[in-house]
From Swiss-Prot:
Transit peptide per record: 1-41
Example of a GO biological process term: mitochondrial electron transport, cytochrome c to oxygen
The keyword Membrane belongs to this UniProt entry's keyword annotation: yes
Modification comment: In response to mitochondrial stress, the precursor protein is ubiquitinated by the SIFI complex in the cytoplasm before mitochondrial import, leading to its degradation. Within the SIFI complex, UBR4 initiates ubiquitin chain that are further elongated or branched by KCMF1.
Protein name in UniProt: Cytochrome c oxidase subunit 5A, mitochondrial
UniProt topology in membrane: Peripheral membrane protein
Cell compartments where the protein resides: Mitochondrion inner membrane
Molecular function via GO: metal ion binding
Task of the protein: Component of the cytochrome c oxidase, the last enzyme in the mitochondrial electron transport chain which drives oxidative phosphorylation. The respiratory chain contains 3 multisubunit complexes succinate dehydrogenase (complex II, CII), ubiquinol-cytochrome c oxidoreductase (cytochrome b-c1 complex, complex III, CIII) and cytochrome c oxidase (complex IV, CIV), that cooperate to transfer electrons derived from NADH and succinate to molecular oxygen, creating an electrochemical gradient over the inner membrane that drives transmembrane transport and the ATP synthase.
Organism in which the protein naturally occurs: Papio anubis (Olive baboon)
PANTHER family: CYTOCHROME C OXIDASE POLYPEPTIDE, CYTOCHROME C OXIDASE SUBUNIT 5A, MITOCHONDRIAL
InterPro entries referenced in this protein's UniProt entry, alphabetically: Cyt_c_oxidase_su5A/6 (IPR003204), Cyt_c_oxidase_su5A/6_sf (IPR036545)
Amino acid sequence: MLGAALRRCAVAATTWAGPRGLLHSARTPGPAAAIQSVRCYSHGSYETDEEFDARWVTYFNKPDIDAWELRKGINTLATYDLVPEPKIIDAALRACRRLNDFASTVRILEAVKDKAGPHKEIYPYVIQELRPTLNELGISTPEELGLDKV
């Protein structure tokens, strides 16, 4: 049974769609066939939403986080196709405050607004959830700074 699955994967890896959508044999199967066969039957673990949130909250709550790690985390988080939960943003804002990096706080809030896209109800919800943290840390939103009119 495993051999049949490997053969199916190897065949899939050695064919390609031509300009009319017809399958043609690849010119040289090479090592891609072996790599593809492994991918066809592997079952990776999936991270739940709660595990994802906990991973990022833990990352930003590291007491020894430095400015480079903070920016790396913000950039990585911004590449995901999602709007981070308020608890992740809260942890990131607190990390910014520990590092006295006001520019990053504004950047985080602008990124959240951008990630919300056409869903106009998401950003106000996130700001509403973060309002106690923003007040506690003395952070102004981009709108309060007048940056939304630029």
